[in-house]
């Protein structure tokens, strides 16, 4: 189980970029795994099943945060006299990245966060979690071709976002 705990935590951290939120999601995932173990049909590997639960929990959490921010913004429109800060800029909290690279990594994660949900999921699972495209397709319940397309669009969208920040790198291609 320790292997799966690291897998779940690291995946959640890559999606959420906050240690405390990743820890909460990790707990939620294992509660769901425990409660749903009898429903596991072995049509995929246990790790793929756990990844799918993790990704779904992370996406649900991100959706809830967006709703909360929108609600706070709308509340602020109707009650501007409350001097409350409604949408705090999230701080970057990702271990293992050297200090001098932190700013660049922060821009990258902000750009990843702005991707459409399905592109973000495919990108994180491929480039950060380093899963094979076939497994990503199983996790996302789509075809390998669809995953390839999502990855291409994610890369193009990230390039556009990062070129806004680093215009001097516009002509560089990896």
Which residues make up each language-model segment?
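Amphipathic, Lys/Arg- and hydrophobic-enriched alpha-helical face
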Residues: 1-19, 36, 112, 161-164
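Short, charged helix-capping/linker segments at alpha-helix termini
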Residues: 9-28, 144, 166-174
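Structural recognition of an alpha-helix C-terminal capping motif at a helix-to-coil junction
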Residues: 10, 24-31, 44-56
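Sigma70-family region 2
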Residues: 14-18, 30-45, 64-66
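Arg/Lys-rich amphipathic alpha helix in sigma70-family domain 2
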Residues: 38-41, 55-73
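Short, Lys/Arg-enriched C-terminal cap helix and immediately downstream tail that follows
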Residues: 63-66, 115, 120, 155-173
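Internal acidic/polar
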Residues: 68-98
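Helix-turn-helix DNA-binding module
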Residues: 106-146
């Amino acid at each position: 189980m320790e292997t799966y705990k690291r897998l779940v935590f690291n995946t959640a951290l890559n999606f959420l970029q906050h240690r405390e939120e990743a820890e909460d999601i990790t707990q939620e995932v294992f509660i769901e795994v425990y409660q749903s173990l009898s429903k596991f049909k072995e049509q995929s590997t246990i790790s793929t099943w756990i990844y799918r639960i993790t990704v779904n929990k992370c996406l649900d959490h991100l959706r809830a945060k967006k709703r909360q921010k929108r609600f706070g913004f709308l509340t602020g429109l109707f009650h501007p006299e409350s001097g409350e800060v409604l949408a705090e800029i999230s701080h970057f909290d990702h271990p293992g990245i050297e200090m001098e690279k932190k700013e660049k990594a922060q821009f990258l994660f902000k750009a990843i966060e702005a991707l459409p949900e399905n592109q973000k999921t495919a990108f994180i699972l491929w480039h950060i979690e380093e899963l094979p495209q076939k497994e990503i397709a199983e996790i996302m319940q789509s075809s390998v071709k669809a995953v390839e397309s999502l990855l291409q669009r994610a890369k193009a969208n990230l390039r556009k976002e990062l070129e806004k920040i680093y215009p001097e790198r516009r002509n560089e291609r990896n």
